[in-house]
């Protein structure tokens, strides 16, 4: 089980990303619009740099929904490999069967 503080920090990041998503998208659109003068694009770059670091979606980390484990997380299920295996063996994951060939 991951420390509760790390799980809460990740949740706080997720909320920050959601809060600034529209503003970031607008600034990035300005930066990539080559029809605008260079000065306006530079101002947009500076405004983007002024946003909080945690507003960037790259800083988000996928964590297991049950344990908070940061590594080996399957996106489709939102679970780490260990818990996914346990639940699959108990038959609690619909459509998942043990491989045999």
Curated annotation (Swiss-Prot):
One of its GO terms (molecular function) is rRNA binding. Pfam families: Ribosomal_S14. Keywords: Ribonucleoprotein, Ribosomal protein, RNA-binding, rRNA-binding. Gene3D superfamilies: 1.10.287.1480. The keyword Ribosomal protein applies. The keyword rRNA-binding applies. GO terms for biological process: translation. GO terms for cellular component: cytoplasm; small ribosomal subunit. Binds 16S rRNA, required for the assembly of 30S particles and may also be responsible for determining the conformation of the 16S rRNA at the A site. Part of the 30S ribosomal subunit. Contacts proteins S3 and S10. Belongs to the universal ribosomal protein uS14 family. This is Small ribosomal subunit protein uS14. The lineage of its organism: Bacteria, Pseudomonadati, Pseudomonadota, Betaproteobacteria, Rhodocyclales.
């Amino acid at each position: 089980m991951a420390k509760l503080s790390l799980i809460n920090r990740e949740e706080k990041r997720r909320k920050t990303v959601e809060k600034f998503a529209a503003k970031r998208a607008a600034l990035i659109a300005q930066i990539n619009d080559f029809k605008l003068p260079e000065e306006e694009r530079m101002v947009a770059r500076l405004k983007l740099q002024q946003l909080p670091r945690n507003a960037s979606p790259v800083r988000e980390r996928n964590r297991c929904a049950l344990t908070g484990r940061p590594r080996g997380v399957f996106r489709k299920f939102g679970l780490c490999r260990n818990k996914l295996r346990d639940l699959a063996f108990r038959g609690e994951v619909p459509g998942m069967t043990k491989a045999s060939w």
